[in-house]
Design a protein with these regions (language model features):
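Eukaryotic N-terminal low-complexity, Ser/Thr- and Lys/Arg-rich leader segments
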Residues: 1-2
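Short, intrinsically disordered, charge-balanced linker/junction segments flanking boundaries
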Residues: 146-149
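Residue-level recognition of specific faces of alpha-helices
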Residues: 5-8, 119
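Phosphate-handling substructures
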Residues: 78-143
Length: 149
């Protein structure tokens, strides 16, 4: 079976994105720019779907459970003229968990534990922030989601 075509859309900007803060699993809402970005993503997706010969109403839509991802999805679907709430939620699509570093900027995380921060920068796939996830953990949960497509 050929690999499915997947259109990924990242959530729009939040104030924490603009400030350089690690959001991870914290539910930080979209800001005004983020809402505009989501609408633009919907318009771009409409063009991609038309180019690829797909009908938006015929493809599945899935989002992370975080509010910023859900609102992005709803704004994208509105731009596609689809029912805004007709999509699935899958927790495996959530952003990487940064544990105790969530809410911090990278300089703040570095200052809190310079040794661990350096190890994490050098080996993101195998080293996690305290209470957070490794990239390997994210790959595993995302891989499980992808295998079910």
């Amino acid at each position: 079976m050929p690999a499915p075509t997947i259109y990924y859309i990242r959530h729009g900007e939040t104030d924490w994105n603009a400030e350089g803060r690690l959001q991870g699993t914290l539910d930080v809402p979209l800001n005004e720019l983020g809402r505009r970005q989501a609408v633009s993503a919907g318009i771009i997706l409409a063009g991609l779907l038309a180019r690829d010969g797909h009908e938006a109403a015929q493809i599945p839509f899935v989002a992370s459970p975080l509010g910023r991802a859900r609102l992005t999805m709803e704004l994208v679907r509105r731009a596609l003229k689809l029912p805004v709430d007709d999509y699935a939620i899958d927790p495996r699509l959530r952003e990487i968990g940064y544990g105790q570093w969530e809410g911090s900027t990278l300089p703040e995380a570095r200052a809190a534990d310079p040794e661990l921060f350096a190890r994490r920068v050098a080996a993101k796939w195998t080293v996690a922030a305290p209470g957070g996830e490794r990239y390997l953990d994210v790959e595993t949960r995302m891989g499980a989601w992808y295998a079910e497509l």
